[in-house]
Amino acid sequence: MSTAPRVVVMGPSGSGKTAVGAALAVDLGVDFVDADDLHPAANVEKMEAGHPLDDDDRAPWLDIVGQTLAEAPGLVVACSALARRYRDRIRAAAPDVRFVELVVSPEELDRRMRSRQHFMPPALLASQLATLEHLGADEPGVAVENVGRILDVARRA
């Protein structure tokens, strides 16, 4: 098992996964990957069309995320990982992964999503929040409120 950390920064769209994950990776001295870049083209097209992904859509993507983590000596990945079963799937490939859940109010998530350009439209936020299962006490990781400066949030993780 590697001593360099493998971390997934998780949360719904707009929670700050990319910004906090990139800052955390720099702080830890490891690489950073945004799992949005690992989505199959069909998933991106589906979301751009305003349709939420289902478990069948997510399965191959989560397998890629897990494999990417498993193959890296240390890595931070920004990945929604909204449901425990998704995190379990990632952990199956990378058992030593730890999760950092970014906690942000639904109102703030909506505001952030409306102020950026992304393939995930704000209309899909409700489906993400309905899918969200907060990190369980028995899961390896921590929940962090994403308020304040990005570097401060990353260091609280």
What are these regions (language model features)?
Residues 6:
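Walker A (P-loop) ATP-phosphate-binding motif of ABC ATPase nucleotide-binding domains
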Residues 9:
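Hydrophobic anchor at the beta1->P-loop junction of P-loop NTPases
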Residues 12:
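P-loop (Walker A) phosphate-binding loop of NTP-binding proteins
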Residues 17:
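Conserved lysine of the Walker
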Residues 22-66:
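Conserved substrate/cofactor phosphate-moiety recognition/catalytic segment
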Residues 72-78, 98:
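Loop/turn-to-beta-strand initiation segments
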Residues 93-112:
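Conserved phosphate-donor/acceptor-positioning beta-strand/loop module used by diverse small-molecule
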Residues 115-156:
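Small-molecule kinase domains that catalyze NTP-dependent phosphoryl transfer to phosphate-bearing small molecules
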